A protein has these predicted regions:
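Polar, enzyme-active/binding microenvironments
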Residues: 44-47, 88, 113-114
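Mature extracellular/periplasmic domains of secretome proteins
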Residues: 66-81, 102-105, 111-114
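A short, glycine/acidic-enriched catalytic loop
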Residues: 12-29, 91-114
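Active-site histidine-acidic residue metal-binding/catalytic motifs
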Residues: 1-73, 79
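Histidine- and/or cysteine-centered catalytic micro-motif in compact active-site loops
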Residues: 57, 88-90
Length: 114
């Protein structure tokens, strides 16, 4: 299977991270953690015979978080992937909600997105 593995969020040109941080609660920086974890996930998927492309936004390049989506979508849409996975962490507070989406493409492939 051809898989795109994307890392949620980025490091902006001004040095700010666009993801959440749970450091206040003993956690971690979402972007840094997902970026590191994506290497492990990609290696495991490749070991099982899949073709994996990691898509990580260039660091200290974007001025705004709104530049992340088109950067990733251009690469995803050009890649003809069977599956797209984007890594995120849940927030360390009770105010955030998780979303589950199921998408179906024109080629009738179904996907679950967390």
């Amino acid at each position: 299977m051809k898989i795109a593995l994307t890392v949620g969020h980025s490091l902006l040109k001004n040095g700010c991270y666009t993801g959440a941080t749970g450091k206040k609660y003993g956690g971690c920086n979402e972007y840094k953690w997902c970026k590191a974890f994506s290497k492990q996930v990609a290696a495991a998927l490749r070991k099982n015979g899949h073709i994996v492309h990691r898509i990580v936004c260039p660091e200290k390049s974007f001025l705004s978080p709104s530049q992340e989506r088109p950067y990733k979508l251009d690469r995803i849409n050009a890649g003809n992937y069977d599956l797209v996975i984007e890594l995120h962490l849940n927030a360390p507070c009770r105010c955030s909600l998780t979303t589950l989406r199921i998408c179906q493409t024109m080629t009738s492939k179904r996907y679950v997105i967390l």
